[in-house]
Amino acid sequence: MVLLPWELEEDILSRLPPRSLVQFRSVCKRWNALFDVKSFNKDQFARARPQFIFITDSKIYSIEIIGLDGVDPTIKLHVLDSSGIPYREWKFAYLTITACDGRWIKWIEYENKGFNVCGVGYDNTRPEKVYKILEYLECRREESSNACYQRVAIYECASHAFKFIDTSNKVWFISDVQRYSVCLNGNLYWLSFDDFRILCFDFSREIVKPFCLLPCRKFDKCDLLALQVFKGDRLSLLNQCCKTRTIEIWVTKKKIDSSNNNGSDEVVWISLLTLPPNNLPNLFIVCYGISYFIYDKTTLIIYCEDENTSAACIYIIRGDLFKKFEIDSSAFFCYHCVYAPNFIPLPLM
């Protein structure tokens, strides 16, 4: 039997989907050891295709998009085991999910703590990624009063260190971060609708700073705007016109990293995709927001609720192709985000 060079063998394995790859852990010790090799995990993660995580009050789904290169793409639902997840015993309203560099993260807080998670990031100036959680706490002004104010805090996952940071409510609204933020290269980015900008929370300096103006300078305040990560290193912005339902996708021309996210350089945006209103869902009336990603610069895959039935749906839209898949018509509450399957451990507790 002719043995393949180990480098080629490793490269082949890194191209397999995580769900398939995990089945090979028991083949031999050398293959099993690969899961602890950082370079292998990094290569595998870079090739991973985005998926959706969808959480209802009774189930957790991983939603895989299949056959995007063909003429008849479809979806595959994986119901994840949630028997050991304690959130089912608590109020569903106190659960938040988000993604950091495409990695799905679930954060749960007890009701009496009153913490609200905004997002997860890390100091991108350090050689090792030390993950941090940005959150805010509702504090009562007086013990006998219901009047509250917000204090912003950072929790460092590895050391369990917790500290409050000074912020100004005149500069940013923390609730916008919680609802609209995405993580790219360790920093959080979100839409500021009051001044038509994208703001950034820099975890290395622990400050909020302006990033850039929105590319669609002229839009109705009723339009739907949604920010996402594009190709793992850029930002994308979805804009649906409230009058015509036309969807336009913008992406940043250059990669976003520590050299060009200081707010002083002009960020160049490119209009990547425009979709006519035929059959497009009405995104600006959804209750639980939208999640989306772009495949091969031509296809929009989007999660939102059906405007008539409120059922959770996945839409695949490309040129003349329009496909709609209903996921769960019984979900009363739901949370969702885009993530990329991977084997990279994330120490959160």
UniProtKB/Swiss-Prot annotation:
Protein name: Putative F-box/LRR-repeat protein At3g16555
F-box domain mapped to chain residues: 1-48
Pfam family, one: F-box
UniProt KW keywords: Leucine-rich repeat
Family annotation (SMART domains): FBOX
Organism classification: Eukaryota, Viridiplantae, Streptophyta, Embryophyta, Tracheophyta
Segments passing through the bilayer: none
Source organism of the structure: Arabidopsis thaliana (Mouse-ear cress)
NADP in keyword set: no
Matching InterPro entries: A_thaliana_F-box, F-box-assoc_dom_typ1, F-box-assoc_interact_dom, F-box-like_dom_sf, F-box_dom
LRR repeats: 267-290
NCBIfam families per UniProt: F_box_assoc_1
